[in-house]
Amino acid sequence: MSKPAFTRAEPDARRLSLIEATARVLARDGASSASVRAIALEAGVSPGLVAHHFGGVDALIVATYRHVGDRVSAALDAAVAAAGNDPRARLSAYVAASFAPPIADRALLATWIAFWGLIIAQPAIAALHDAQYASYRGGLETLLAACELAPAARRHAAIAITALVDGLWLELCLSPRVLDAETARGIAEAQIAALLR
């Protein structure tokens, strides 16, 4: 007996399946190829389910950005929690998590690149990006406060660390033979040590 072309699932599972399919399409084919038809085909569902669950591809891409951002946040939070109570160790764990799976992942990089391309053209993605990065910086500011960095310096330090980590993460994912995770961590740690002096 042959497998049916489309499968049935509970609404939450179907929504997650569509979100994960969207991330794969974005990573593999880029934002310009993230159509209802391509995503439905990737998820193994009818195109009508995209409209049913999300109203259209734009809302699905927003949901995918939120999902991917939440996964990154969860990985960062888990690393910080596992580091114990020492403030400097917690900050180091936050940074190091960016250079290890599941964050240091070429498929994730490809998905983020697609999202970054959409920020300019789609206000909803731009707003979500701003909120996501504000959350990252807020977490860093909390970690920096625990490291006793002066309040006036925390915001700029969080921006600098975010930019530094993003740049190293990008290079690590694009050219792992040029920059490995250990070297990325070392560079980040040296710069953060200078910020904390």
List the predicted regions and their residue ranges.
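N-terminal intrinsically disordered/low-complexity leader segments
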Residues: 1-13, 24
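Hydrophobic/aromatic-rich alpha-helical bundle segments in the mid-to-C-terminal region
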Residues: 7, 126-130, 146-196
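Hydrophobic/aromatic residues within well-ordered alpha-helical segments
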Residues: 14, 57, 64, 68, ...
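Generic hydrophobic, amphipathic alpha-helix propensity
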Residues: 14-23, 39, 64-68, 72, ...
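Helix-turn-helix
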Residues: 17, 21-63
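Hydrophobic alpha-helical connector segments
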Residues: 63, 77-108, 157-161
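Amphipathic alpha-helical packing segments from all-alpha helical-bundle domains
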Residues: 73, 103-113, 121-148, 156-159, ...
